[in-house]
Amino acid sequence: FETALLKLSFWFSLNYLALNPDKSEATLLGTSHRNLTLADISAVNVAGSTIGFVDNIKLLGVTLDKSLTFRKHIALTSQSCFYHIKALRHIRHTVDFSTASLIAHALVSFRLDYANSILSGSPKTAILKLQRVQNTLARIVLRSNRFTHSAPFLERLHWLPVHSRIRFKLATITYRALSTSSPHYL
């Protein structure tokens, strides 16, 4: 563990980088059993700087927790989406269908799609929270009440359900990795 930290410190110095301990965070990723065995480590020292451990870190817009359950990421994504859905709900009566659909894609759908391939192994209950976001969005775009079944709305809007979007994204990534249009490291 310490040799890896020394190598990291050496790499920083080779690339003229300085570690800012005030902005740096560390976490231990693994199973809950493995994390319990490493619970006695409270901080790490890298090049004389002490970095404390946190339960969740944000990396490229994805919130990672220690056990890689993505619960916090799904909760934050849902919260952000519902904030924008609320804004769309307030203006929905003033815009036509095509504009509402465009706003829905611009403000909410991309949040559901961003890095969703990492959720492929998540339990259905976790994906269901994101599906509720999409169902609410479809109801607002189509001006329907909240008690109507949402599957016909998704079909009418030509939107895949969230679990299908995840599978489609994985299939797309796989196809691009196998085709000639992908970078050599994939």
Which positions does each model-derived feature cover?
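Hydrophobic/basic alpha-helical segments
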Residues: 1-186
